[in-house]
Each structure stands twice: as structure tokens, then as C-alpha cells.
């Protein structure tokens, strides 16, 4: 009922537009091709419905399709859960432990992060997935992971059907010569008489579906193991990055701090139960979380504030000396810039001569930073940050002592 309520409720009708994106279109096409070809191959050529095994096989194929689509659409339409706009903690004094989101005009609750694609602060955000055209987060993590498990299992079943269909239909039709292999599609089969002949077109379609099924099994199966690692450690991909930076910060400044990740409850089973429950809904409200006994609700958010302050201290001021149109791979900026573009979904930003940028990290050919905006844009909560070619900027000579440490010294 979750998916039906998400679609039927008037306020959420706009969610249907998530289907009109290359990710869901490709995903649903692959599901449709593999499912339909497996069913057709079974009924027509391999395992007819007038046998017990054929009937059981047909029911299993239908069940795989239903379960895969159920979890896929729930992951898409139920969504990750969003922090309410202009949200504030119940206790006013807790504001000092939280980051403020200028776009949502509210504070970021623990474990939440702002998604550029969804344009909202997402509860326990792991990542924005293009295949569901939505974020993977608190409310849909179980659905998303179940989909990642069921899709490879269904594809393995379908792949076996494809292989056995081609084997049984081609076994008596293949002849091997010294230098060639011949397939006589007009030769009769001796096992059972199919509803229609297994033609070259049917062979090509089955072979194509087999490739899709095997590719999906490998690709989606790898994603499943990544998500299970996230769940069993109760640590999202973003939080793993924050923890890594925390250790680097402590080591770099020799602060002697002992950072403990707050959301790992010490038991894989306890971590697992935070996402998968008998009711189907995850534990918690997406705002407050069970934490390690030596931590509190704001242990991670305080660390994030420290890292944010550290990033500001290490930022370096640059002035734009060359125009840049924001292209992903700008050939006009040199071959090294073209071929060594950052492999990330983070945006590129347009540059105009005379603009000022505070760079926080970079590579040999690219830099990442925040553009200095005018007062009106700043009040409106506008923030422009992203990657740009290093050759388009030059370091300001009057850079302050606090900002003089270049990013080349320590890249993130």
C-alpha cells in the first residue's frame, strides 16, 4: 500500500515525473526485456505450461517480476524522507551543534544532507541513485536494498532459462566443420514440438536478453554487497567519508582526540534491525537516532562543523583570469584538462573574468571551490560551487596568512 498511497495522494502526484528520466527508463526496460523473454522462452520453446515443472517455473518468474517491481517502485516513490523545511531542533541551545541549510532555510538534522538533485535535505542520505531517480535514505533503504538483492536473483533464473532454451533448440541443429560452424534452423527438434519455430530472430532476442541478465547480475549484485556493508556497519557512504576525514584531521593537527563513530551499535544484527523490520518501516523518525554509549546525538554533527571550519581555514582565494563555460570536458582548455576531468557527479561552474573563488581542493588540472557572490545573492541563499579548470584562475597575491596554505599541500 505504500506505493499506492505515494502515487494516489494528490500532493505526491508530481512524484510520477520521476519515471521520465533516463535511469528509470533504462532500468524498467531491462526488467521488462528479461522478464518477458524468460516467460516467452519458457512457454514457447523450453518448459511448456502443460507440465508441472513448467507451471512452477512460470509462477516463479511472475513472482520475481512482481517482487522486483514492488521494491523498485517503493524505493522510487516512497523516497528517503525529507527534513521539514525551516526545521529547528526542539531545544534552542542545540542549534549551535548543527549546520544551517540556506536552501531549505532550516537546520540539518543529524545524518541528513542536502541533495542538489532533490533540492531538499534528506534523512540519513546515502547517495542519489539515478536508477530510481531519487535518493537512497532513511525510509526507502530497505526497499532499495531488497531490489538490489531480488534483481540479480531474478536475472540468474532468467539467464538459466535463456541458456537452456538455446541449448535445447540448437543442439540438433549445429554442425561443426574443420573451419566453420553451421546452424540449420530448419532442422526438426526431437524433444517436443514448440508452439512456433525457434527462428534466427528468436535466437538473437534470447542472446540479447542473456547479455542483459548477466550484466545486471554482476553490476547490481556488486551494488547489493556495497549496501549490505553500509547497513551492517550502520554507516552511510557519506558518513564513511566524514569518518575518514575526521581521522585525517586528528592526525594532521595532532589534537589527541579519540573519534568514535556514533551510529555503529556494536553488533551487525542490531545495525541490520535499524533498517529491516517486520513492519517494513525502518526504526526511528529520521531525526533522532540510537547511538554508541560514549556518544550523543550531536557527535557527528560537531565533527562536521570542525571539518567545515578547517576547510574554511585552508581555502585559498583565486581570481578568474580566463572564461569557462562550465563544460564537462572542455577541449579548448588543453588536452590534459579534457582527458583528466574529475569523474564525479559534482557540477562544473561557469567562470567570468574578474570573479573571485575560494578553492578548497583540487587536482593537477582541476580545482573545486565556492564562487564569491554579491550581497543580494547571498541573502537569497544562493551558493555556486563546483569544479573548474585550474588554468582559468590565478592565486591572489594578497591572500591572508590563514588562507595561504595551498590545496596542493594536502588534497582531499
From Swiss-Prot:
Q: What is this protein called?
A: Palmitoyltransferase ZDHHC6
* Annotated transmembrane regions: 25-45, 58-78, 144-164, 206-226
Family to which the UniProt record says this protein belongs: Belongs to the DHHC palmitoyltransferase family.
Which GO biological process categories is it annotated with? protein targeting to membrane
Which residues constitute the catalytic centre? 129 (s-palmitoyl cysteine intermediate)
A Pfam family:
DHHC
Cite the ranges annotated as topological domain Lumenal. Answer: 46-57, 165-205
Organism of provenance: Danio rerio (Zebrafish)
**Taxonomic classification, please?**
Eukaryota, Metazoa, Chordata, Craniata, Vertebrata
Enzyme Commission numbers on file: 2.3.1.225, 2.3.1.-
**Regarding domains, what does the record say?**
The DHHC domain is required for palmitoyltransferase activity.
Q: Does the keyword Ribonucleoprotein apply?
A: no
Coarse class of the protein's main subcellular location? endoplasmic reticulum
One GO cellular component term: endoplasmic reticulum membrane
The record describes its membrane topology as:
Multi-pass membrane protein
- In this chain the SH3 domain maps to 313-398
Chain positions of motif Di-lysine motif: 409-412
Q: Which GO terms describe its molecular function?
A: protein-cysteine S-palmitoyltransferase activity; protein-cysteine S-stearoyltransferase activity
Record carries keyword RNA-binding: no
Q: Where is the DHHC domain?
A: 99-149
- Record lipid sites (S-palmitoyl cysteine): 328-329, 343
Q: Keywords on this record?
A: Acyltransferase, Endoplasmic reticulum, Lipoprotein, Membrane, Palmitate, SH3 domain, Transferase, Transmembrane, Transmembrane helix
Q: Which InterPro entries match?
A: Palmitoyltrfase_DHHC, PFA4/ZDH16/20/ERF2-like
Q: Where in the cell is it found?
A: Endoplasmic reticulum membrane
Q: What class of enzyme is it?
A: transferase
Q: What is the role of this chain?
A: Endoplasmic reticulum palmitoyl acyltransferase that probably catalyzes the addition of palmitate onto various protein substrates and is involved in a variety of cellular processes. Could also function as a stearoyltransferase.
* Cytoplasmic side of membrane: 1-24, 79-143, 227-412
Catalytically driven reaction(s) = L-cysteinyl-[protein] + hexadecanoyl-CoA = S-hexadecanoyl-L-cysteinyl-[protein] + CoA; L-cysteinyl-[protein] + octadecanoyl-CoA = S-octadecanoyl-L-cysteinyl-[protein] + CoA
Amino acid at each position: 500500500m505504500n506505493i499506492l498511497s505515494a502515487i494516489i495522494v494528490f500532493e505526491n502526484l508530481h512524484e510520477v515525473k520521476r519515471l521520465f528520466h533516463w535511469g528509470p527508463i533504462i532500468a524498467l526496460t531491462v526488467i521488462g526485456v528479461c522478464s518477458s523473454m524468460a516467460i516467452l522462452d519458457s512457454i514457447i520453446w523450453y518448459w511448456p505450461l502443460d507440465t508441472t515443472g513448467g507451471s512452477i517455473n512460470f509462477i516463479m518468474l511472475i513472482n520475481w517480476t512482481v517482487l522486483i517491481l514492488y521494491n523498485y517502485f517503493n524505493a522510487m516513490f516512497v523516497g528517503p524522507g525529507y527534513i521539514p523545511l525551516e526545521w529547528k531542533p526542539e531545544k534552542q541551545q542545540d542549534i549551535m551543534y548543527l549546520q544551517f541549510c540556506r536552501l531549505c532555510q532550516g537546520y540539518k538534522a543529524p545524518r541528513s544532507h542536502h541533495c542538489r538533485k532533490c533540492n531538499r535535505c534528506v534523512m540519513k542520505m546515502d547517495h542519489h541513485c539515478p536508477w530510481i531517480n531519487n535518493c537512497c535514505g532513511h525510509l526507502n533503504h530497505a526497499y532499495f536494498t531488497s531490489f538490489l538483492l531480488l534483481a540479480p536473483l531474478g536475472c540468474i533464473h532468467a539467464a538459466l532459462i535463456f541458456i537452456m532454451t538455446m541449448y535445447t533448440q540448437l543442439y540438433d541443429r549445429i554442425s561443426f566443420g574443420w573451419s566453420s560452424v553451421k546452424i540449420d534452423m530448419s532442422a526438426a527438434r526431437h524433444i517436443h514440438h514448440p508452439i512456433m519455430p525457434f527462428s534466427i530472430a528468436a535466437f538473437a532476442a534470447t542472446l540479447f536478453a542473456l547479455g542483459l541478465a548477466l550484466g545486471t547480475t554482476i553490476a547490481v549484485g556488486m551494488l547489493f554487497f556495497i549496501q549490505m556493508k553500509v547497513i551492517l556497519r550502520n554507516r552511510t557512504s557519506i558518513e564513511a567519508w566524514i569518518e575518514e576525514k575526521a581521522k585525517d584531521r586528528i592526525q594532521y593537527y595532532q589534537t589527541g582526540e579519540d573519534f568514535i563513530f556514533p551510529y555503529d551499535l556494536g553488533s551487525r544484527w542490531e545495525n541490520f534491525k535499524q533498517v529491516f523490520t517486520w513492519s517494513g518501516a525502518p526504526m526511528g523518525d529520521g531525526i533522532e537516532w540510537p547511538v554508541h554509549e560514549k556518544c550523543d546525538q550531536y557527535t557527528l554533527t560537531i565533527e562536521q562543523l570542525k571539518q567545515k571550519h578547517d576547510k574554511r581555514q585552508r581555502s585559498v582565494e583565486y581570481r578568474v583570469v580566463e572564461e569557462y563555460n562550465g563544460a564537462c570536458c572542455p577541449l579548448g582548455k588543453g588536452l590534459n584538462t579534457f582527458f583528466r576531468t574529475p569523474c564525479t557527479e559534482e557540477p562544473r561552474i561557469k567562470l567570468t573574468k574578474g570573479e573571485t573563488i575560494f578553492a578548497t581542493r583540487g587536482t593537477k588540472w582541476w580545482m573545486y571551490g565556492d564562487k564569491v557572490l554579491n550581497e543580494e545573492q547571498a541573502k537569497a541563499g544562493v551558493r555556486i560551487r563546483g569544479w573548474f579548470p585550474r588554468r582559468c584562475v590565478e592565486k591572489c597575491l594578497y591572500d591572508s596568512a590563514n588562507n595561504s596554505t595551498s590545496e596542493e599541500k594536502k588534497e582531499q
